[in-house]
């Protein structure tokens, strides 16, 4: 066969070759087909990028989720009629801002890169034996060697498996068709899973209960239910944990291990989100402002809790006594007053506490640490609340007023003592 036979439908079929020359990860997809009227969209427009430092902070579950999202972006571009070359294996490195990513390959591992390449397709190459159409001469030659039992390219990045897959596809045994756009693909494991997602299937099945999930990360979280929803090795802990990242944070709280450290003051934190929030204190950033009183906050959680002061909403209620709280953590601490549970014990003297912050403050009595220092006089304290009260000596602020006589006080405890003089209590 020396020319295109349009009656056999060879030309309309999209050429998908697993042997096209690999390009650098994230190469922009710049051209539509010649008859397209839409503006060009690049892979960079939909890509999610990480620096090597940020990538190192992700756990395995988060990396699997990244793979799933990038695959979906990749296939969405394909579905709007882009040409691309699909390799049979995925690069095992994150798509980053400062990395060449010219690394090796591992099968069926975490997907972390997408490779796409623009082609002009000014000239089509036809296999006269089977009618397969190729975009480049290199692909056709590789295809012919595979058909003739020639060089299998052992030692290159694709290997025998890719030759076999391509050979099967070239003789009409397409492994799958992407129905939304009619494209034909030779499947990799990752692509096979993604096609199931696009077709509404849930490829990740729980072996315990049979429930299906679209993403591996969702299945990983679900598995925590079957192992008791509590992976924390500390028996006194009441947290229900279903993910490995939450477990690491919880263990860090109990052991005192803090791996994230700020460059400005050297203070350490158990997780990156706490470090980010603390970094704003050095920059003076307060992004969330209350419209009621003008007070500003560095994070949304503190802002939302503050708003409840104005609204009076206390959604967390104690079933024992009916007392309500603005935060669930405050309710948890309160419940321990009914149960008598004090899970946090000092290893030095054995004194126990209902909350971890109480233990942390108590330990400073043994170590002599006083991290809160007054900028006016240099006096240091082991509690931030004590420093706040001390500052009022310098500012002259007395926010606590007696409703009986109008006298004001620096602390609420001083006002409480004063009120007893009016009531006659001792």
From Swiss-Prot:
The source's superkingdom equals Eukaryota
* Pfam families according to UniProt: KRAB, zf-C2H2
Keyword vocabulary terms for this entry? DNA-binding, Metal-binding, Nucleus, Repeat, Transcription, Transcription regulation, Zinc, Zinc-finger
- Please explain the role this protein plays, according to its UniProt record: May be involved in transcriptional regulation.
Please give the family membership noted in the entry. Answer: Belongs to the krueppel C2H2-type zinc-finger protein family.
The principal location of this protein is nucleus
Location in the cell reads: Nucleus
Domain KRAB residue range list: 41-120
UniProt xrefs under InterPro entries? KRAB, KRAB_dom_sf, Znf_C2H2_sf, Znf_C2H2_type
Q: Which organism is it from?
A: Homo sapiens
- Zinc finger regions (C2H2-type), where? 176-198, 204-226, 260-282, 288-310, 316-338, 344-366, 372-394, 400-422
What are the GO cellular component annotations?
A: nucleus
Q: Which PROSITE patterns match?
A: KRAB (PS50805), ZINC_FINGER_C2H2_1 (PS00028), ZINC_FINGER_C2H2_2 (PS50157)
**GO biological process: any one?**
regulation of DNA-templated transcription
- The protein's name: Zinc finger protein 562
The Gene Ontology terms for molecular function here are: DNA-binding transcription factor activity, RNA polymerase II-specific; RNA polymerase II cis-regulatory region sequence-specific DNA binding; zinc ion binding
SMART domains under this entry?
Answer: KRAB, ZnF_C2H2
Check the record and name the PANTHER family matching this protein: C2H2-TYPE DOMAIN-CONTAINING PROTEIN-RELATED, KRUEPPEL-LIKE TRANSCRIPTION FACTOR
Give the gene that encodes this protein.
Answer: ZNF562
CDD domains xrefs: KRAB_A-box
């Amino acid at each position: 066969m020396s020319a295109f036979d349009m009656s056999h439908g060879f030309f309309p079929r999209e050429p998908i070759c697993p042997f096209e020359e690999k390009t650098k990860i994230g190469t922009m997809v710049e051209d539509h087909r010649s008859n397209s009227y839409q503006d060009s969209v690049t892979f960079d427009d939909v890509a999610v990028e990480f620096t090597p430092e940020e990538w190192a902070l992700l756990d395995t579950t988060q990396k699997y989720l990244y793979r799933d999202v990038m695959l979906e972006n990749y296939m969405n571009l394909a579905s709007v009629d882009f040409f691309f070359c699909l390799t049979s294996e995925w690069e095992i490195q994150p798509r980053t801002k400062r990395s060449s990513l010219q690394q090796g390959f591992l099968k069926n591992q975490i997907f972390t890169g997408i490779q796409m390449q623009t082609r002009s397709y000014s000239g089509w190459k036809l296999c006269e034996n089977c009618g397969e159409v190729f975009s480049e001469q290199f692909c056709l030659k590789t295809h012919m060697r595979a058909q003739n039992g020639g060089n299998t390219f052992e030692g290159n990045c694709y290997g025998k498996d890719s030759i076999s897959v391509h050979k099967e596809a070239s003789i009409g045994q397409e492994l799958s068709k992407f129905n939304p756009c009619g494209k034909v693909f030779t499947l990799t494991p990752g692509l096979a899973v993604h096609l199931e997602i696009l077709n509404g299937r849930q490829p990740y099945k729980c072996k315990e209960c049979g429930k299906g999930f679209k993403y591996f990360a969702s299945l990983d979280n679900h598995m925590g239910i079957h192992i008791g929803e509590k992976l924390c090795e500390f028996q006194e802990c009441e947290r229900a944990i279903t993910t490995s990242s939450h477990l690491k944070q919880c263990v860090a709280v109990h052991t005192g291990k803090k791996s994230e450290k700020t460059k400005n003051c050297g203070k350490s934190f158990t997780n990156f989100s706490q470090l980010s929030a603390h970094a704003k204190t050095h920059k003076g950033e307060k992004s969330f402002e209350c419209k009621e009183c003008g007070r500003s906050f560095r994070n949304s959680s503190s802002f939302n809790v503050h708003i409840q002061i104005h609204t009076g909403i206390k959604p967390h209620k104690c079933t024992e006594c009916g007392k309500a709280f603005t935060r669930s953590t405050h309710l948890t601490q309160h419940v321990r007053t009914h149960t008598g549970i004090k899970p946090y014990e000092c290893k030095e003297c054995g004194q126990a506490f209902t909350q971890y912050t109480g233990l942390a403050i108590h330990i400073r009595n043994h170590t002599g640490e006083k991290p809160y220092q007054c900028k006016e006089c240099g006096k240091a304290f082991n509690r931030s609340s004590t420093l706040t009260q001390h500052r009022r000596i310098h500012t002259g602020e007395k926010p606590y007023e007696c409703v009986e006589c109008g006298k004001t006080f620096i602390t609420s405890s001083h006002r409480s003592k004063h009120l007893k003089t009016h009531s006659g209590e001792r």
